[in-house]
């Protein structure tokens, strides 16, 4: 299996021409548009124009939905329902773009347990999944470094309750307390996931909201082996700087060439 190789636009901010030129020059298959700081416009004409520009920059893409102020599992049902409604717009955008998938967060920024409602989370995730299916879009949820998706047991419980597929974030898994405290490895975390892994965010580790690049193939090889074994064929190199992106791409290229 040769994975589809994409990168997140972070190093280039919103410079679409630079993003397009870099994608072509470096032979990437696609781009993940991370929209937390890049919201969709309400006016239909302006939204259509913005999506056309993203499509021109890369016909192959995935979307990372906003998360900073949206929580479908919030204990405040009004907030959770509103977040679910807003995220439907990003499912619509993914449908219009023909995106590979749209990825969401749950339990962002490791809220206190009493800030979340599992009932609201499961109900709203089911609503979003049904809507995504209606629109012909694959919806994924991502493991985070903190919160309910940061430990295999609680994450797997949510996945079993909902059947939602996963974007497996390698750096979040390596940076979470479960791995850092030696209770298991990144590969152990990955293998505990009971639903399909449709995509992966590839980098070494997240610390203080920064994504760090691997230095050698050995840093990532066991995890990449496990992703391939799991059938995950959409890899997003999610780095914040061009230097880190280039370093990670070199490691991934070396890994793929050795197979």
State where each predicted segment sits.
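C-terminal helical cap(s) of enzyme catalytic domains, especially alpha/beta-barrels
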Residues: 244-259
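H/E-rich (His + Asp/Glu) clusters that bind or coordinate divalent metals
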Residues: 223, 227, 235
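Hydrophobic faces of well-ordered beta-strands that scaffold small-molecule active sites
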Residues: 3-9, 31-33, 61-65, 102-104, ...
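Acidic/histidine-rich catalytic cores of soluble enzymes
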Residues: 131-217
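Acidic-and-aromatic substrate-binding clefts and catalytic sites of carbohydrate-active enzymes
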Residues: 8-18, 34-49, 71-74, 109-114, ...
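Active-site acidic/histidine proton-transfer and metal-coordination neighborhood
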Residues: 73-166, 218-221
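N-terminal pre-domain/capping segments
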Residues: 1-91, 95, 164-165, 255-259
């Amino acid at each position: 299996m040769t994975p589809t190789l994409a990168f997140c636009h972070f190093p280039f901010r919103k410079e679409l021409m630079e993003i397009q030129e870099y994608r072509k020059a470096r032979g990437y298959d696609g781009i993940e548009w991370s929209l937390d700081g890049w919201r969709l416009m309400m006016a239909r004409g302006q939204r259509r124009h913005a999506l056309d520009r993203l499509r021109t920059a890369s016909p192959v893409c995935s979307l990372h939905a906003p998360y900073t102020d949206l929580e479908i599992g919030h204990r405040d049902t009004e907030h959770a329902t509103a977040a679910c409604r807003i995220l439907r717009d990003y499912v619509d955008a993914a449908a219009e773009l023909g995106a590979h998938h749209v990825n969401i967060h749950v339990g962002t920024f490791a809220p206190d347990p009493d800030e979340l409602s599992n009932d609201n989370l499961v109900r709203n995730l089911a609503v979003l999944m049904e809507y995504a299916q209606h629109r012909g879009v694959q919806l994924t949820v991502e493991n985070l470094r903190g919160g309910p998706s940061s430990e295999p047991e609680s994450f797997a419980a949510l996945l079993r309750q909902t059947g939602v597929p996963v974007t497996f974030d390698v750096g979040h898994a390596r940076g979470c307390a479960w791995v850092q405290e030696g209770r298991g490895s990144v590969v152990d975390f990955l293998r505990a996931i009971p639903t399909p892994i449709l995509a992966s965010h590839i980098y070494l580790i997240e610390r203080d909201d920064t994504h760090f690049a691997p230095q050698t193939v050995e840093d990532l090889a066991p995890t990449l082996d496990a992703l391939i074994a799991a059938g995950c064929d959409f890899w997003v190199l999610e780095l914040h700087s061009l230097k880190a992106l280039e370093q990670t791409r070199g490691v991934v290229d070396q890994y793929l060439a050795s197979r």
